[in-house]
């Protein structure tokens, strides 16, 4: 049976691929290892023998999305944050900043989509609407009327899908 592995995070920070020996084992066991960026692939190859660098098993498929012409007339004065509501994703930065922004800009609103059971970061404002988890279709509908999408991850995110989806 073929085994295909897809990395969309930093391989050196993930259990099962932190050590050189673990990554060599993955190369031996997998038919293909797909990365979402050259950066992710290069991180995977860190300290590996030169023989692995040119392996045909390793390929990069960059993130993509169907794009449509954006109708700016349908955009509203909405600032949106989508993702895990934790410090790693920068929700604490967004939360404290959005309160100031909303206080200074009375005609703007903010929407937060996501959840996080481990961290309880709470921000309250009468024009801050925290929706919790939403399915992908609902998120895309909200992005279509959003003027500003905020992605403020703290960690080395190879390529966050949220930024791609909000731009398409």
Give residue ranges: language-model regions:
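Acidic donor-binding loop of glycosyltransferase active sites
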Residues: 144-158
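Conserved donor-binding/catalytic core segment of Leloir-type glycosyltransferases
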Residues: 34, 71-89, 95-99
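Short alpha-helical segment that forms part of, or immediately flanks, the ligand-binding pocket
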Residues: 140, 163-168
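Active-site proximal beta-strand in glycosyltransferases
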Residues: 1-13, 34
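Glycosyltransferase donor-sugar binding loop
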Residues: 82, 95, 108-122
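Nucleotide-activated donor-binding/catalytic signature segment of Leloir-type glycosyltransferases, i.e.
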Residues: 114, 118-141, 148
């Amino acid at each position: 049976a073929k085994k295909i592995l897809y990395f969309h995070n930093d391989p050196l920070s993930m259990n099962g691929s932190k050590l050189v020996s673990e990554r060599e084992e993955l190369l031996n066991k997998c038919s293909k290892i797909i990365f979402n960026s050259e950066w992710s692939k290069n991180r995977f190859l860190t300290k590996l023998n030169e023989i692995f660098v040119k392996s045909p098993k390793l390929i990069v498929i960059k993130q993509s999305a169907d794009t449509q012409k954006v109708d700016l007339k349908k955009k509203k004065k909405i600032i949106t944050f989508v993702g895990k509501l934790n410090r790693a994703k920068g929700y604490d930065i967004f939360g404290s900043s959005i309160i100031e922004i909303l206080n200074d800009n009375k005609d703007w609103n903010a929407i937060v989509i996501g959840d996080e059971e481990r961290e309880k970061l709470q921000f309250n404002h009468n024009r801050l609407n925290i929706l919790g988890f939403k399915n992908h279709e609902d998120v895309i509908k909200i992005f279509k009327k959003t003027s500003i999408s905020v992605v403020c991850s703290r960690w080395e995110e190879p390529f966050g899908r949220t930024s791609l989806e909000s731009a398409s």
